[in-house]
């Protein structure tokens, strides 16, 4: 072969290899940044009942207005009949001295919240004064949940929690909400999930790669369900089925009484978000930058919407719209049927925590420590507050309670 042919052969080989590298690189990029899959409102889409349409009795709501992370068993983050709108006056504020990574629950005239440095507080809802405080030697990075006159708080690994030892023990502690006295505890791996009580069963996930169902009367596990990786997000419940996700890139639906698998579905990266159940669908964000909609009964992928950044945020739902934030610094209102964008809002900072919808206003915070209240129909900015970082807002029928970075606020709607 002549020298010229050698050169041409080498050039051709380089071009082929270069093309192969380019294709491989494109495939890797696509896997890490998958695109949008548009859905349809004609497939597995139930519109006969809005989230919150089957409400709890009024006397129960007055007693326990915000019982769990995400407000209800379906984690819809929409509270019907809570007519509290901006502008607000700060009625009280309370320093906690440590990060509030997850929002409080509200019951019995008190606001219950855990701090990252292991303190669990009961705060008077009207005055902001501490009623009691219980200190643990473990970090807290999850909301509590209310049962029948018992409040359950998850605990992570021992201090310093930043070491995150994978084999460390964690607990869910049952506490008397009136006195703060510990009633009993259940040991598992590290518990970062916000638990849920349905009937006599307490559900939560753990870093030991399992979902647990614990009988609150016997304090024993009724069943456990193994996954392929850590379970960091909380479960949701609807129609006898428990829905949850794992860091093994999967969403699971299991029989809530037996733990038997009904279906599983996959994403292309980790699921940190807690699922939201509405309209016959399961809505959940993924660190691949997409929001997914799966069929509640089938597990079929119905749509996936790319947001341009990680989606750690759990979703809120209201009036056939899915509300969710992204690390792309944008907050989205998506059509629950198709996944199409109804509107989006440039928040100026990455969004990690979950939104809340109250009286037509959707609230969320950015990692820049700013909270927004937007018109949920149009995306118009109605209100801002210079604190808040993760999932900021819960409420009762008199006030909004805002979890700031290291402060808790009681906000009263302005008269008129």
What are these model-predicted stretches?
Residues 53-90:
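Blade/loop signatures of beta-propeller domains
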Residues 25-31, 60-71, 97-119, 138-172, ...:
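Repeat-blade elements of multi-bladed beta-propeller folds
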Residues 18-28, 41-43, 72-74, 82, ...:
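Short, C-terminally biased terminal segments at protein or domain edges
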Residues 28-52:
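Ser/Thr/Pro/Gly-rich low-complexity linker/stalk segments immediately outside membranes or between
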Residues 124-128, 176-179, 215-219, 255-259, ...:
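Short loop/turn segments that connect beta-strands within beta-propeller blades
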Residues 91, 129-132, 181-184, 220-223, ...:
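A structural motif specific to WD40 beta-propellers
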Residues 1-17:
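N-terminal Sec-pathway targeting helices
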Residues 93-95:
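Short amphipathic
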């Amino acid at each position: 072969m002549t020298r010229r042919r050698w050169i041409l052969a080498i050039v051709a080989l380089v071009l082929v290899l270069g093309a192969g590298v380019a294709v491989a690189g494109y495939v890797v990029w696509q896997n890490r940044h998958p695109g949008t899959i548009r859905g349809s409102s004609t497939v597995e889409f139930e519109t006969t009942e809005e989230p919150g349409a089957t409400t709890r009795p009024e006397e129960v709501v007055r007693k326990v207005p915000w019982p769990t992370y995400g407000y209800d068993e379906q984690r819809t983050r929409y509270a019907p009949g809570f007519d509290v709108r901006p502008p607000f006056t700060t009625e009280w504020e309370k320093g906690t001295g440590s990060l509030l990574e997850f929002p409080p629950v509200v019951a019995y005239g008190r606001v219950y919240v855990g701090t990252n440095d292991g303190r669990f507080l009961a705060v008077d809802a009207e005055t902001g004064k501490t009623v009691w405080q219980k200190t643990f030697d473990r970090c807290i990075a999850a909301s509590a949940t209310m049962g029948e006159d018992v409040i359950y708080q998850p605990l992570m690994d021992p201090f310093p929690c930043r070491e995150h030892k994978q084999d460390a023990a964690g607990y869910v502690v049952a506490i008397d909400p009136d006195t703060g006295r510990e009633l009993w505890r259940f040991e598992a791996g590290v518990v970062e999930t916000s638990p849920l009580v349905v009937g006599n069963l307490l559900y939560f996930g753990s870093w030991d790669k399992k979902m647990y169902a614990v009988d609150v009367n016997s304090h024993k596990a009724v069943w456990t369900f193994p996954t392929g990786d850590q379970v960091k997000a909380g479960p949701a419940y609807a129609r006898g089925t428990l829905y949850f996700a794992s860091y093994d890139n999967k969403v699971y639906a299991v029989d809530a009484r037996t733990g038997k698998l009904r279906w599983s579905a996959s994403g292309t990266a980790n699921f940190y978000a807690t699922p939201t159940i509405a309209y016959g669908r399961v809505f959940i964000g993924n660190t691949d930058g997409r929001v997914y909609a799966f069929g509640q009964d089938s597990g079929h992928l119905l749509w996936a919407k790319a947001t341009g950044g990680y989606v750690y945020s759990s979703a809120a739902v209201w009036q056939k719209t899915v509300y969710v934030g992204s690390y792309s610094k944008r907050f989205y209102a998506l059509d629950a049927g198709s996944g199409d964008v109804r509107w989006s809002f440039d928040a100026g900072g990455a969004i990690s925590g979950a939104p809340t919808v109250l009286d037509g206003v959707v609230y969320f915070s950015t990692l820049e420590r700013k909270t927004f209240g937007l018109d949920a129909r149009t995306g118009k900015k109605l209100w801002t507050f210079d604190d808040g970082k993760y999932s900021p807002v819960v409420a009762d029928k008199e006030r909004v309670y805002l979890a700031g970075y290291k402060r808790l606020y009681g906000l009263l709607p302005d008269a008129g």
